[in-house]
C-alpha cells in the first residue's frame, strides 16, 4: 500500500497521471493520493488499516524502464501485456499498411531509435521496449498512418525488432538495381507520365522508373539536356591556315 501526500504547490495533473500508470502496472488500487490541507483531517486520512505486502521483498536493479517492467512481471506474473492509460511512456506503434507509403519520415525523427528501417529492403521496423510514446512519428506522418497504443509488453518480443510494414522494391528498367517502393514508383508514374511538362514524352517518363545513376545518364544524353552548354567550336588546325594562303 502506497500513500502519496500532496503539498499545496504540487501539480495535481502530473501526479494523478503517474498514479494511474502505477495502478495499471500493479493491477490493484493500492496507490492513494492524499490531498488534505486540514491537519486534523490529515491525521484521520493517514490512520488506515495496514495492507499486507503484495510480494516478497526484492531489490530492483536497472533503469527506470527496467524497474517498471520488473514491477509489472512481479505484481502481475500471469500478464503478458498490460494496458496503460494515455500519456504513459510505454507502448506500441500501430501502422495502417494501406495508407503507409514507407517514406520513413518517422524513422528519421524517432528520438529513441524505436523505429528503424532496412537498408536493403523497403521495411519499417519497430522495437517496443525503446518506444517513449512521444508521438513525433504520428505527428510527422504525411499519410496519418500511425497511431499509438499505450501498453507495457512483458514478453521477450518487446526487445526484438518486428516488421510493421514492408513492400516489394522497384527494379530499375535500365540496370535492374532495386530502389524505392514498387507501389510508390508506379503511382508516381501514373500521375506524372504524359501529364506533367517534365515528363510529357515517353522517354522522359521512363526516367521516373530509373535509379539515380541511370536517370542522370539518360538525362545527360537527352536532346533537351538542361546541363548541356553551347556547341563547342571546331578546333582550328594548320590546314585551315594553309588553305587561306594564295600560294597554297
Task: Describe each region flagged by the PLM.
Residues 1, 201-248:
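Charged, low-complexity interaction segments
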Residues 1-3, 92, 123, 226:
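Beta-sheet entry/capping signal
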Residues 125-127:
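Accessory beta->alpha helical hairpin/"wing" motif in late/C-terminal subdomains of nucleic-acid enzymes
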Residues 6-17, 23-120, 130, 140, ...:
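Ferredoxin-type iron-sulfur electron-transfer modules and their immediate structural context
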Amino acid at each position: 500500500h502506497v500513500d502519496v501526500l500532496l503539498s499545496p504547490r504540487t501539480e495535481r495533473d502530473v501526479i494523478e497521471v503517474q498514479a494511474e500508470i502505477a495502478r495499471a502496472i500493479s493491477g490493484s488500487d493500492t496507490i492513494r493520493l492524499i490531498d488534505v490541507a486540514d491537519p486534523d483531517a490529515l491525521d484521520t486520512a493517514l490512520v488506515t488499516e495496514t495492507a499486507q505486502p503484495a510480494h516478497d521483498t526484492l531489490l530492483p536493479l536497472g533503469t527506470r524502464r527496467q524497474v517498471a517492467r520488473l514491477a509489472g512481471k512481479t505484481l502481475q506474473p500471469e500478464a503478458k501485456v498490460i494496458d496503460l492509460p494515455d500519456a504513459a511512456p510505454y507502448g506500441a506503434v500501430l501502422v495502417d499498411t494501406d495508407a503507409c507509403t514507407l517514406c520513413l519520415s518517422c524513422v528519421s525523427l524517432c528520438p529513441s531509435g524505436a523505429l528503424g528501417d532496412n537498408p536493403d529492403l523497403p521495411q519499417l521496423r519497430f522495437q517496443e521496449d525503446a518506444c517513449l510514446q512521444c508521438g513525433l512519428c504520428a505527428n510527422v506522418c504525411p499519410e496519418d498512418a500511425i497511431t499509438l497504443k499505450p501498453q507495457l509488453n512483458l514478453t521477450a518480443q518487446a526487445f526484438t525488432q518486428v516488421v510493421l510494414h514492408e513492400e516489394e522494391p522497384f527494379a530499375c528498367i535500365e540496370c535492374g538495381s532495386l530502389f524505392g517502393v514498387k507501389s510508390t514508383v508506379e503511382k508516381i508514374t501514373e500521375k506524372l507520365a504524359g501529364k506533367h511538362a517534365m515528363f510529357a514524352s515517353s522517354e522522359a517518363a521512363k526516367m521516373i522508373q530509373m535509379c539515380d545513376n541511370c536517370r542522370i545518364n539518360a538525362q545527360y544524353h537527352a536532346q533537351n539536356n538542361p546541363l548541356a552548354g553551347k556547341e563547342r567550336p571546331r578546333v582550328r588546325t594548320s590546314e585551315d591556315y594553309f588553305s587561306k594562303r594564295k600560294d597554297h
